[in-house]
């Protein structure tokens, strides 16, 4: 690193040595001291410039200690700054008020307000002061709360000066000395000399070089040229006279201006007249307030010299007048008087400011006039000898003119109103000349706010549209929402993004810029776009809610399906366990039919003692069920279903009868109803006699039960394959009964009934042969059945029922309801009711009729 101080001190010493030698100090000691001080200052400058602290703004060096916020000076807010400024102005105004009340005045009045109104004084105080000194506006008179015409002079003086009202017969206090007795005739207001306006020379008639030469403009007969008396204020001290006190200031103001400078631009010179507390030999307070007049607005009593409205000639004091002003700038909603058109055409979006109206007659352009009292006291301008106050000079010349009503009466009451541009009219806009600036500021502020709001609205509008586009169209299709109209190339297919009304489309084509809606003509388009945006947002929220609902429904459905799958798996597992426990006495369960028939139905008939009340179960017990059954999983519209079911029940009934009377009797209740539904033409006894063991078997089948080496106990049943539902139309599913033999056996049955022996109505033989009638055996009740060979199939032992043949329609009296049938016994005679056959119960129709058994 090296010695930084040494390296920093070298250039400083060299530079300052050269400068010191060039200057050439007077003494070596002085030179040494100066060089040392310069080196120290230079080293300090360079050290502060090259120090590491100077790179702290780059984040390289410097102290890492944070600044304490308490040590830093707190920044003053705008509101605090305004409040501090107003407080300072209030203090200054209070001091000026006290000074003005003590030293200044105009004709017995004051140049500052006296507290009738406590609100902010936002009028132009210099303008009001100038108008009051010029006697164009009434001064701020002291107001009285009460006034009586019977008050004496000393009572009026006491009340005006703020003292308590004395008694009428009280001795008045000592009056001040009358200075008018010591004045020369020229200063005596009761004399016949000219008035005080001739004491000063008007500024407008003098040039800058003529200010010191008064003899050029004043006549020798002027009172200023006459020798004053020794008691005259001018003779006593002319240099200190108030008439010459502001001469240097006036010359300075004239030197900075031009000769053609207007009177309003140039600050006029104020002159303070001698203080005279008397007017016409009486106190000035008594002279002013002896004919007091009440202000109709503030209800205070003032001297009769009040302002008069230009329109209706009503009195109004100056404190009330300065409070009346224009209303604040506002939109031109309720503005539009046909009689008073706006001075300049206003745009729709700009603010307007209406002139103040008269509080009495509501005439616009409120203004007042003022006629001063017939004397002068206090401050005056040195150019008041000229108009507009020249007309009032005759009223202040002498006592006779003061007492003469002919001079002052013509202007007291007017029959017509004065024009607003009259030179004697003072309007509210003159009192507040900044109304135009306030209006322009308000308009500028409104325009700035409108521009900011428009920019914010456009930014939000464009950002919202862009975000919507990115969320909906992920393929890069951008909607040109920042322009007024849609282009065909923007969408890729020449299709607008949405239907818009014609007015919006036309306005969009007319305003094809980045910031629509800046002008007032495009406000409606912005509102339409906002409504469209709100509608699109509502639609988007609705679609999102619908998608959420669908997603929730799908989730719930998946949960339900999962639960159902678990439940089915548990049921299958239980069924498999139950099958493995029971053993080899059962056929394998049909797992596909668990939902239709149930698992427990196969094991419901335990040990061959349970009554089978179901027509088609999935599994069966070979001990009490036939070797074959028809499953109910076939189509319900199969016309052969009920026939196959009934046939299986009949075969089961006959096969169970071969086992023994106990099994047959137990199985009869479940098959009796099916037998009755099939045919009432034959009895169960005849069916038992005609049945042969192993008569209906397919080729290649044996009567062994699955898993057993013994023949099936019910070997004479219909043996189908393990599928339980063989295809329709196969020989194994054809009808097992010859209904033609049923018709042919009607005649032998009638003969059998006559003989009283058992009848044999069915004989199953070859498939293509007609069923033979059984011989009548009235003596022998039984006939040995002929055993068919095992290789004869179902097609050889049955006859097929063709679809073209009429089928048998059986009227079921009980409907499809299955009820337990009474016990059936085989009888030998024909007197049993069960063996009887009614011919009328059998009918033949042309067509198929399906009667459901379920």
Swiss-Prot record:
Where is the protein situated, by its record's location annotation?
Cytoplasm
Kindly indicate whether the keyword Cytoplasm belongs to this entry. yes
Compositional bias per record (Basic and acidic residues), positions renumbered to this chain = 65-103, 328-338, 546-563, 635-645
The name this protein carries in UniProt is Protein SIP5
Residue ranges under compositional bias (Polar residues)? 44-57, 191-220, 228-242, 254-266, 624-634, 646-660, 777-815
* Ranges of biased composition (kind: Low complexity): 20-43, 391-401, 596-606, 675-695, 706-735
Q: Per its UniProt record, what InterPro entries does this chain match? A: Sip5/DA2
- Tell me the protein family, please: Belongs to the SIP5 family.
Functional note: May negatively regulate the SNF1 kinase.
What does the UniProt keyword field contain? Cytoplasm
UniProt organism field: Phaeosphaeria nodorum (strain SN15 / ATCC MYA-4574 / FGSC 10173)
Q: Which domain of life is it from?
A: Eukaryota
Q: Where is this region: Disordered?
A: 1-103, 162-242, 254-274, 328-350, 381-415, 482-529, 546-839
* Assigned GO CC terms: cytoplasm
């Amino acid at each position: 690193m090296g010695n930084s101080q040494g390296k920093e001190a070298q250039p400083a010493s060299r530079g300052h040595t050269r400068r010191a030698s060039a200057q050439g100090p007077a003494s070596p000691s002085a030179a040494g001291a100066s060089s040392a001080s310069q080196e120290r200052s230079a080293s300090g400058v360079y050290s502060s410039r090259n120090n590491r602290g100077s790179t702290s703004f780059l984040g390289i060096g410097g102290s890492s200690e944070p600044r304490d916020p308490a040590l830093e000076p707190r920044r003053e807010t705008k509101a605090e700054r305004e409040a501090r400024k107003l407080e300072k102005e209030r203090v200054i105004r209070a001091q000026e008020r006290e000074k003005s009340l003590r030293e200044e005045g105009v004709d017995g009045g004051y140049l500052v307000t006296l507290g009738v109104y406590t609100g902010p004084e936002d009028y132009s105080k210099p303008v009001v002061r100038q108008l009051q000194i010029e006697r164009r506006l009434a001064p701020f008179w002291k107001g009285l709360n009460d006034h009586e015409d019977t008050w004496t002079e000393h009572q009026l003086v006491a009340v005006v000066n703020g003292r308590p009202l004395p008694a009428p017969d009280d001795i008045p206090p000592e009056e001040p000395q009358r200075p008018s007795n010591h004045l020369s005739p020229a200063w005596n207001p009761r004399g016949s000399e000219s008035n005080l306006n001739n004491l000063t020379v008007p500024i407008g008639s003098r040039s800058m070089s003529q200010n010191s030469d008064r003899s050029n403009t004043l006549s020798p007969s002027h009172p200023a040229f006459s020798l004053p008396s020794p008691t005259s204020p001018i003779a006593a001290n002319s240099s200190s006279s108030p008439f010459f006190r502001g001469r240097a200031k006036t010359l300075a103001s004239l030197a900075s201006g031009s000769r053609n400078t207007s009177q309003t631009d140039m600050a006029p010179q104020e002159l303070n007249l001698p203080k005279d507390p008397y007017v016409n030999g009486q106190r000035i307070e008594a002279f002013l307030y002896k004919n007091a007049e009440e202000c109709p607005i503030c209800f205070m009593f003032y001297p009769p010299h009040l302002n008069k409205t230009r329109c209706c000639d009503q009195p109004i004091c100056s404190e009330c007048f300065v409070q009346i002003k224009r209303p604040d700038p506002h939109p031109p909603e309720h503005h539009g008087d046909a009689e008073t058109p706006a001075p300049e055409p206003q745009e729709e979006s700009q603010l307007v400011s209406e002139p103040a109206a008269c509080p009495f007659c509501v005439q616009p352009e409120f203004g007042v006039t003022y006629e001063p009292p017939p004397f002068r006291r206090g401050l005056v301008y040195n150019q008041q000898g000229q108009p507009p106050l020249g007309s009032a000079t005759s009223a202040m010349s002498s006592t006779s003119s003061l007492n003469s009503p002919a001079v002052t009466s013509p202007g007291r009451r007017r029959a017509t109103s004065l024009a607003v541009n009259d030179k004697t009219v003072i309007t509210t806009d003159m009192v507040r000349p900044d109304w135009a600036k306030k209006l322009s500021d308000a308009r500028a502020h409104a325009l700035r706010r409108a521009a900011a709001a428009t920019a914010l609205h456009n930014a939000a509008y464009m950002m919202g549209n862009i975000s919507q586009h990115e969320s909906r169209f992920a393929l890069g299709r951008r909607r040109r929402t920042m322009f007024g109209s849609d282009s065909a190339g923007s969408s890729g297919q020449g299709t607008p993004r949405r239907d818009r009304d014609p007015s919006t489309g036309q306005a969009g084509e007319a305003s094809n810029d980045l910031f629509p809606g800046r002008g007032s003509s495009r406000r409606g388009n912005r509102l339409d776009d906002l409504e469209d945006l709100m509608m699109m947002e509502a639609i988007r929220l609705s679609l999102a809610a619908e998608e959420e609902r669908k997603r929730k429904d799908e989730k719930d459905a998946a949960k339900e399906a999962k639960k159902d799958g678990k439940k089915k798996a548990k049921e299958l597992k239980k069924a498999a366990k139950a099958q493995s426990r029971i053993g080899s006495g059962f056929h394998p369960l049909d797992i596909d039919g668990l939902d239709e028939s149930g698992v427990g139905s196969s094991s419901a008939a335990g040990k061959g003692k349970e009554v089978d009340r179901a027509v088609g179960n999935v599994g069966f017990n070979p001990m009490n069920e036939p070797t074959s059954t028809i499953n109910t999983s076939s189509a319900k519209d199969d016309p052969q279903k009920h026939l196959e079911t009934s046939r299986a029940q009949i075969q089961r009934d006959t096969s169970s009868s071969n086992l023994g009377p106990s099994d047959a009797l137990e199985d009869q209740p479940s098959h009796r109803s099916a037998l009755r539904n099939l045919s009432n033409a034959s009895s169960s006894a005849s069916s038992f006699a005609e049945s042969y063991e192993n008569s209906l078997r397919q080729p290649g089948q044996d009567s062994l039960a699955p898993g057993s080496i013994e023949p099936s106990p019910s070997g004479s049943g219909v043996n189908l394959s393990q599928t339980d539902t063989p295809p329709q139309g196969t020989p194994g599913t054809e009808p097992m009964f010859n209904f033609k033999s049923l018709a042919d056996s009607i005649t032998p049955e009638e003969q059998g009934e006559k003989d009283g022996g058992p009848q044999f109505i069915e004989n199953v033989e070859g498939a293509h042969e007609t069923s033979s009638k059984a011989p009548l055996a009235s003596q022998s009740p039984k006939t040995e059945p002929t055993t068919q060979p095992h290789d004869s199939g179902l097609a050889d032992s049955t006859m097929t029922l063709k679809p073209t043949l009429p089928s048998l329609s059986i009227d079921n009296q009980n409907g499809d309801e299955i009820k337990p049938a009474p016990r059936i016994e085989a009888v030998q005679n024909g007197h049993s009711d069960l063996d009887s056959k009614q011919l009328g119960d059998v009918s033949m129709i042309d067509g198929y009729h399906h009667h459901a058994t379920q």
